[in-house]
Amino acid sequence: MKTLILLSALVLLAFQVQADPIQNTDEETKTEEQPGEEDQAVSVSFGDPEGASLQEESLRDLVCYCRARGCKGRERMNGTCSKGHLLYMLCCR
């Protein structure tokens, strides 16, 4: 009985592993069909409207991009952004 449960769990795990690359391929295809969405500039502001905040000057000039395939060069991932039902990486420098 334990062997049957173990084999069932392994089969389910194998199906899940095979299903994940298919979902990723579908998302990449949708992204490739819409060029120009990968590098969307986003202006990020920290602080209150009066500008009296305790932030560093480097944070005020933060430039971020929504990227589908990962951050480039000096950028680092600071979260996610979405367009429709697709999630992208929020890469800032």
Curated annotation (Swiss-Prot):
One GO location term (cellular component) = extracellular space
Q: Name one GO biological process term.
A: antibacterial humoral response
Query: Where does it localize?
Result: Secreted
Chain positions covered by the region annotation Disordered: 23-54
At the top level of its lineage, which domain of life is listed?
Eukaryota
Alphabetized, the UniProt keywords read: Antibiotic, Antimicrobial, Defensin, Disulfide bond, Secreted, Signal
Disulfide bridge positions per record: C64-C92, C66-C81, C71-C91
Specify the signal sequence span: 1-19
Q: InterPro entries per the record?
A: Alpha-defensin (IPR016327), Alpha-defensin_C (IPR006081), Alpha-defensin_N (IPR002366), Beta/alpha-defensin_C (IPR006080)
Q: Which residues form the propeptide?
A: 20-58
Reported function: May have microbicidal activities.
Q: Which family does it belong to?
A: Belongs to the alpha-defensin family.
| Protein name as annotated | Alpha-defensin 24
What species is this protein from? Mus musculus
